[in-house]
Every structure is written in structure tokens, then in C-alpha cells.
UniProtKB/Swiss-Prot annotation:
Family affiliation: Belongs to the PsbB/PsbC family. PsbB subfamily.
Listed Pfam families: PSII
One of the record's GO cellular component terms: photosystem II
Classification lineage: Eukaryota, Viridiplantae, Streptophyta, Charophyceae, Charales
Protein name listed in UniProt: Photosystem II CP47 reaction center protein
Length: 508
């Protein structure tokens, strides 16, 4: 047929049978990729330390999505929460992967069948005998079925009525587990961090979809609207479908990057704004103050801080610290976290407690400055020693650790104090294993960053695709030079511009 690569889809334009075939094949590829990717991730995933080496540190992409829908067990005998299990059942990680691959194979066969048997009676208009699709009717069917699925997910899966529920956690990502959710029907359901809104919105949207589907099945569109929106043209379907997809992609980019109940930090890692706002630092400080007010010593108060919470308060887990071309999981950057050294408390020789000013997100290097509780600079690591007034040596800074591996250990050696001051810039101080994965020390992004980046890029691309195909549909007659309502017979080749009698070709 000699079509250029960008016009090959023309072959399914007026061929409903093969249009279905290519869509089934596309679904087969998507399902096959999902199953294969899940198996690959399970092959490289190390479930041994859910606290310091969770899935998001290891760069897992599909495992978090399975987990948030209620899958937590593996046929390998482990659970995502760390305990050993004996009977994972069919709906394990491997079970879901296998189902996707089996579905992919069946869809592959169905696509071949529909490609071979393309000329079915079903696709022919009984009045004209030509291939035709009743697009408004198909729209109604799809709307009804997707509404049914949406309602079923909200009413049964999320609520635990017939299903596992979804991943629910506290605001600080400490106590996450899969549990059933009650729908939130009040204003609180619109809080993006309230999981009850997920149930209620799916139920409401599902009911709306079912009713809208039944409406479109029982009511034909008015002729003017049908013509104005080119409802008889399958490219209209393409254009509006692309619009739906890019709109959804923009929405999920936002819910992923800014955080929501649907993107828990235990599965996708913390957001950059939690570092920017000192979210975990404030919670840790609150817990320490509470413990000391209850009579615990400083050391005991810091020892009560969960290692998981301390690990969130570390800049290397900020998804905005990764670079665009730094491929690979976070563990390939700063290494695999081994343990928390404890909270470093700095003091000068006058007894002032000093706080290291933390590095902002978009800095690669940042001056090491130590301030007291009033914000007055007391010490720093000078760039030029000759002019320094606040150097560690001059001020006599010492460091003592509370909680963690170095609990109650103090250092006064200036070189050691400087080392820990530099590391305190990055939040809580952890020990990392950089040899196992040959980690290069350069921060990587979490799946939260990769998901956002990918979906924003494709949303932008699909936005232009929507404009392109929408324009082609609406202005088809202008582009083709044929009035769609023309009644007179047109002979191809007589006119230079098709259907324009003023451009009749001159014969020699």
C-alpha cells in the first residue's frame, strides 16, 4: 500500500473488525508488560528490610501499585510488612503477574482471530450493507460498563465488602497496612489525604457512569449535535479518548507529586514538600518534647523515635534530589541504608545548643552553618580559614549523639565534628552500604519522581495529539477540499482541487 509510517493507521479507518483487532493487541501488550515487569521486579526485590530498604528505595514501580490495591504476600514466603507467611493464596504478587501474562496470551489470540475474521455481519449497516459502527451506542455501552466497574471497585473492593480494602497509613507513614475503608460522604471526602473519599467518589462516579451509559443507550443524539461534533467519524472517538487520557495523566501527576491518600509515602516514598516544610523534623521534635515532659531522659526520648520516621527525615529520600538523567533506584545513589547513627546535638564551649542549617532541595552544595535556638550564627565551616571567626576550632564545637547506634557517644575532635556537621545538613544521619551496589554517591529520585515526570511528559504529548486529531475531525472537509454535504457526483481527476468546478483541468 506504500503508506508512510505516520499514516499506517489509515488501514483500520473503515474496517471495524481490524480496528477491534489492533485494540485487543494493544491491551495484550499492556497486560503483558505489566505482568512481565512485576515478575522482573519480584526477581530483583529484596524484602528483608521494610524499614531502611523499602520498595521505593529499590526503585520498584509496579509493586507499589499492586500493594496499594491490597496485595501484600508473595509465593516466596514473605510479606511486604516484614513477617513470614505460609499461605499467600492466589492473589499474591506472583499470582497477579501470572494472571496478567495469561490474559495477555488470550488477548493475543483474540487479536489474531479478529484480524483474520474481520468482515463480520455485525459490523455492516443493515440499511446500506457497508461497514459501519454505531459510535453513540458504543459510547453508551462503554460508559455503562466502566461505570459498573467504577461502582464495584468503590462499593466492594475499597470498602472490604468483597475484597481486601486498600493500603491505609497514618500521616507520617509509620503504621501502614491494607484495611477496609468506609466511604466519606461529607465535605471531608474532598480532602485528598482522606482515603474515605476514594470509596465515596468511586461509588458516586460509578452511579453517574451507569446512569449516563443507560441514557446514551436509550437516547439518540440530535442531528445537529451529531453533525457538529462529527459523531459519525471514528477520529472523533480518537480525539476525545486522547483528551480523557491526558486529563487523567495531568491529575495523577499532581496527586503523585504533591501526595494524596492514593499515593502513600510507605509505597512511593515521601514528597519533596515534606522535606521543604520540615514535616518529619517537626513531628520528631514534638515526640521528643513529649517524651522529655513525661520524665524520659534526652537519650531515652530519642531512642523512642521509630527508625522509619527518622529515615523519612533525610534529604536523600526527597524525590526532587534526583537528576533527570540519573537512572536507577535510590539505593544506586547514596547506597543501601544500614542503620541510624542517632540524632546529632552540637554544642559550643559556652554551652549553647547549635542546629545545623539544612540544605534546601535544589542545592547540590550548601554552606555549613550552625545557629543557636534564636537563629544567631555561632559556628560554620569557613571557605577561607584566614578570615574565619566562627570555625569549629575557634568556637570549640562538640557533638553528642542520642538514640541510634551512637547513643550517648560524643566527639570533640574538630575533624570528626566537621564530618557530622556536613552530614547533619542532610537531615538525620545514617550509615550506608555503598559497596554492594557500587553506589556512586549521587542522589537518585524515587518512583514518585519518575511517575510524575513520565505522566507529565505523556500528558503534554497527548494534549497536542488531542488538538491534532480534533482539528482533523472538525475541519476534515477543509483539509480534504470536499464539502461533506455535497450531493453532486464528483469524478476524481477532473478538477485540480477536488469538487471545485472553478479549477477544471485544461486538456491540451
Amino acid at each position: 500500500m506504500g503508506l508512510p509510517w505516520y499514516r499506517v493507521h489509515t488501514v483500520v479507518l473503515n474496517d471495524p473488525g481490524r480496528l477491534i483487532a489492533v485494540h485487543i493487541m494493544h491491551t495484550a501488550l499492556v497486560s503483558g508488560w505489566a505482568g512481565s515487569m512485576a515478575l522482573y521486579e519480584l526477581a530483583v526485590f529484596d524484602p528483608s528490610d521494610p524499614i531502611l530498604d523499602p520498595m521505593w528505595r529499590q526503585g520498584m514501580f509496579v509493586i507499589p501499585f499492586m500493594t496499594r490495591l491490597g496485595i501484600t504476600k508473595s509465593w516466596g514466603g514473605w510479606s511486604i510488612t516484614g513477617e513470614t507467611i505460609t499461605n499467600p493464596g492466589i492473589w499474591s504478587y506472583e499470582g497477579v503477574a501470572a494472571v496478567h501474562i495469561i490474559l495477555s496470551g488470550l488477548l493475543f489470540l483474540a487479536a489474531i482471530w479478529h484480524w483474520v475474521y474481520w468482515d463480520l455481519e455485525l459490523f455492516r449497516d443493515e440499511r446500506t450493507g457497508k461497514p459501519a459502527l454505531d459510535l453513540p451506542k458504543i459510547f453508551g455501552i462503554h460508559l455503562f460498563l466502566s461505570g459498573l466497574l467504577c461502582f464495584g471497585f468503590g462499593a466492594f473492593h475499597v470498602t472490604g465488602l468483597f475484597g481486601p480494602g486498600i493500603w491505609i497509613s497514618d500521616p507520617y507513614g509509620i503504621t501502614g497496612k491494607v484495611q477496609s475503608v468506609s466511604p466519606a460522604w461529607g465535605a471531608e471526602g474532598f480532602d485528598p489525604f482522606n482515603p474515605g473519599g476514594i470509596a465515596s467518589h468511586h461509588i458516586a462516579a460509578g452511579i453517574l457512569g451507569i446512569l449516563a451509559g443507560l441514557f446514551h443507550l436509550s437516547v439518540r443524539p440530535p442531528q445537529r449535535l451529531y453533525k457538529a461534533l462529527r459523531m459519525g467519524n471514528v477520529e472523533t472517538v480518537l480525539s476525545s479518548s486522547i483528551a480523557a487520557v491526558f486529563f487523567a495523566a495531568f491529575i495523577v501527576s499532581g496527586t503523585m507529586w504533591y501526595g494524596s491518600a492514593a499515593t502513600p509515602i510507605e509505597l512511593f516514598g515521601p514528597t519533596r514538600y515534606q522535606w521543604d516544610q520540615g514535616y518529619f523534623q517537626q513531628e520528631i521534635d514534638r515526640r521528643v518534647r513529649l517524651s522529655t515532659s513525661q520524665g524520659f531522659s534526652i537519650s531515652e526520648a530519642w531512642s523512642r523515635i521509630p527508625e522509619k520516621l527518622a529515615f523519612y527525615d533525610y534529604i536523600g529520600n526527597n524525590p526532587a534530589k534526583g537528576g533527570l538523567f540519573r537512572a536507577g533506584p535510590m539505593d544506586n545513589g547514596d547506597g543501601i541504608a544500614v542503620g541510624w547513627l542517632g540524632h546529632a546535638v552540637f554544642k559550643d564551649k559556652e554551652g549553647h545548643e547549635l542546629f545545623v542549617r539544612r540544605m534546601p532541595t535544589f542545592f547540590e552544595t550548601f554552606p555549613v552553618v550552625l545557629v543557636d535556638e534564636e537563629g544567631i550564627i555561632r559556628a560554620d565551616l569557613p571557605f577561607r580559614r584566614a578570615e574565619s571567626k566562627y570555625s569549629i576550632e575557634q568556637v570549640g564545637v562538640t557533638v553528642e549523639f542520642y538514640g541510634g547506634e551512637l547513643d550517648n557517644v560524643s566527639f570533640s575532635d574538630p575533624a570528626t565534628v566537621k564530618k557530622y556537621a556536613r552530614r547533619a545538613q542532610l537531615g538525620e544521619i545514617f550509615e550506608f552500604d555503598r559497596t554492594t551496589l557500587k553506589s556512586d554517591g549521587v542522589f537518585r529520585s524515587s518512583p514518585r519522581g519518575w511517575f510524575t515526570f513520565g505522566h507529565l511528559c505523556f500528558a503534554l504529548l497527548f494534549f497536542f495529539g488531542h488538538i491534532w486529531h480534533g482539528a482533523r475531525t472538525l475541519f476534515r472537509d477543509v483539509f480534504a477540499g470536499i464539502d461533506p454535504d455535497i450531493d453532486s457526483q464528483i469524478e476524481f481527476g477532473i478538477f485540480q482541487k477536488l469538487g471545485d468546478p472553478t479549477t477544471k483541468k485544461q486538456t491540451v
